[in-house]
Amino acid sequence: MKALALLSGGFDSPVAIYLMKNKLEIDALHFSLEPFTNDIPEKKSIELCKKLGIKNLYVINHSREHEEIVNKCDHRYYYVISRRLMYKVAEELAKKLNCDYLLDGCNIGQVSSQTLSNLSVITQAINIPILR
């Protein structure tokens, strides 16, 4: 079984990878927001993959889409719309890589996109199971 892990460079996603790496083959995906942010999250993701033994890290620049969402969407829904888009992109890559799951280090209730109702809306955008 294989999973594509969404790796932000934060705390929760590497914990999810660590917990599942002995059960699944895992590739990782990082969404870069350069030039809106610096390259620190990308560098952290590269370093985390090395430490966790993840051989394949895919980096997708998401800055153009991020800018569109910020400029055109109701800001109350920013996180939900952004996550839905990232999940759709991740699902497409997961299909190409023959992954069975997406792996997300979601910490339920931590931020607005991670409430149960918002997670439900986000998850409806894709057809691949998500391990959280």
Which role fits each region the language model picked out?
Residues 2-45:
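ATP-dependent adenylation/pyrophosphate-handling site
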Residues 5, 28-30, 59, 104, ...:
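Structural beta-sheet core signal
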Residues 7-13, 58, 83-86, 112-113:
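A general structural motif
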Residues 18-22, 50, 92:
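Short, well-ordered alpha-helices that flank and scaffold nucleotide-derived cofactor binding pockets
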Residues 31-34, 62-63, 106-108:
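Short, ordered loop/turn segments at secondary-structure junctions
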Residues 48-72:
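A conserved beta-strand->alpha-helix junction
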Residues 66, 75-132:
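Active-site adenylate/phosphate-handling loop in enzymes that bind or generate adenylated species
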